[in-house]
């Protein structure tokens, strides 16, 4: 039976996560699914898996900015350059990890994404977080105070560690049942999973998952005509 929950791993530093968040409620509603938003620290995922972030690779950063501008235009979703990038998302992520009522928490998450990617506000600043908290009716001053407590810090750390243990390596990532999907571009496959029509062939996948290509060997073996 298809899963009725989409676990959504995100970090405000990702414009793809913002685009995904604008579309996820409608997608979930089509299948009567609930959304379980899980803030994680993208930098923690990168470190755990030995990766560089897109912003650390200039060619990739430029390509992704252009690619996301195209996606936003097709979706008719506003997308503007952030005030700073990369930036420290910890305070906003910790605030989003607090035990708020689900509707209020979703409103806060949406407002924080919009603050970064539409309004060019610097969500690393407590005053900005307080303002946004007031705008969505969750009490900005209390929100900032709670987000700075050890419990909020521990929650974000635990969520990030759990995501890593589940194989999450980037944001946004969506978990439907036991299947992990990565990036806004995977939404068609998320939808198929929610509909109970995942096209992945189990027998074929067993062949792929049983294959072994040590990374050290891949780095040593190059085509004869490769130029170093």
Task: List each language-model region with its residue ranges.
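Extreme N-terminus of proteins, especially the signal/transit-peptide cleavage junction
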Residues: 1-4
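Structural alpha/beta surface segment adjacent to cysteine/selenocysteine redox centers
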Residues: 12, 18-119, 204-226
């Amino acid at each position: 039976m298809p899963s009725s929950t989409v676990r959504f791993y995100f970090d405000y530093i990702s414009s793809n996560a913002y685009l995904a968040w604008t579309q996820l409620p409608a997608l979930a509603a089509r299948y009567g699914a609930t959304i379980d938003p899980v803030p994680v620290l993208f930098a923690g995922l990168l470190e755990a898996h030995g990766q560089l972030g897109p912003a650390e690779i200039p060619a990739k950063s430029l390509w992704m900015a252009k690619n996301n501008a195209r996606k936003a235009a097709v979706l008719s979703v506003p997308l503007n350059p952030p005030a700073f990038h990369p930036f420290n998302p910890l305070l906003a992520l910790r605030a989003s990890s607090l035990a708020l009522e689900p509707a209020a928490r979703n409103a806060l998450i949406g407002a924080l994404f919009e603050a970064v990617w539409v309004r060019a506000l610097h969500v690393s600043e407590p005053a900005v977080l307080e303002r946004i908290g007031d705008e969505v009716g969750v009490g900005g001053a209390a929100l900032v105070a709670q987000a700075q407590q050890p419990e909020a810090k521990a929650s974000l750390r635990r969520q990030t560690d759990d995501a890593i243990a589940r194989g999450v390596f980037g944001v946004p990532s969506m978990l439907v049942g036991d299947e992990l999907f990565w990036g806004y571009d995977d939404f068609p496959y998320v939808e198929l999973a929610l509909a109970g029509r995942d096209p992945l062939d189990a027998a074929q996948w067993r062949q792929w998952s049983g294959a072994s290509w040590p990374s050290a060997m891949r780095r040593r073996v190059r085509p004869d005509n490769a130029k170093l």
